[in-house]
Amino acid sequence: MDQKDESSSRFWEFYALRYSVGAVLGGLILFLLVQQSQPISSLVFVKSGEPIDLIQVGIFLAAGLVFSYVASAPILVLHAGRFLIQRYTLRLQRPSKSMVWFLGLTLVIPVAFLSLSAMSALLRIWFAVVIFLAVAVVLAQFFIIVKCLLRSSDLYGFYEKLANKRSSAKGGIVDSYRHLREQGNAFGILFFQVVLGLFVFAATMFSSYSNSFQSQSPLEVAVILVLVVLTWILPAALVWLIACMIEKEFVES
């Protein structure tokens, strides 16, 4: 097998590793959402508390693969903005303005919810933690997108150097860091699946918990799910702008 065929084979191995486990976990998360969330179960073919057959298991696995792909959206943004990673020493340093803004904006919504919500203390804490995780994941991606667009020259310089280095390297260090990164991607996707699952559950159940378990119509639940998915994938969709910026720098260089 030549170098090109070997690279292609490993490319598909990386994707198989990344999404095979994610499909199983995604199917499990969707099954739990259907079983535990009455609003979501009203939209699908399986009702809460009912047993499922093998065909439905297969459908859950297929849906879990889609869920895994959607949940992996933040990985794309992190991958695009990896040139922003810097070397830091262990000594304490003053946080940057971006970090201060990020922490402030991430904390303001869950803190406001804790202060203003009329739910019980346990429910307030649970919802606040989920809100914090969701806001942190989404907001961090917007910060990365903005920094990539503002530092387009550094962005292009990184990818240009990377392309030159890779063209002259065969195996060795390239295969090593790719293997490590893809293993990290696989576990990162599992993490983001859990966060997205909590986000979906909290968003669809919030009205029920805040209104004495008043049921929602299927249309209301569908609208909530669409808004959650759009919020989750919007930063990843903006990576298109980063790719166009790299292309523009390439043409003008």
Question: Which functions belong to the PLM regions below?
Answer:
Residues 38-47:
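Extended intrinsically disordered, low-complexity coil regions enriched in Ser, Thr, Gly, Ala
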Residues 1-17, 45-46, 161-173, 250-253:
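N-terminal juxtamembrane cytosolic/stromal segments of multi-pass membrane proteins
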Residues 14-39, 53-86, 97-161, 175-249:
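Alpha-helical transmembrane segments and immediately adjacent membrane-interfacial amphipathic helices
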Residues 88-93:
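Amphipathic, cytosolic membrane-interfacial segments at TM-TM junctions
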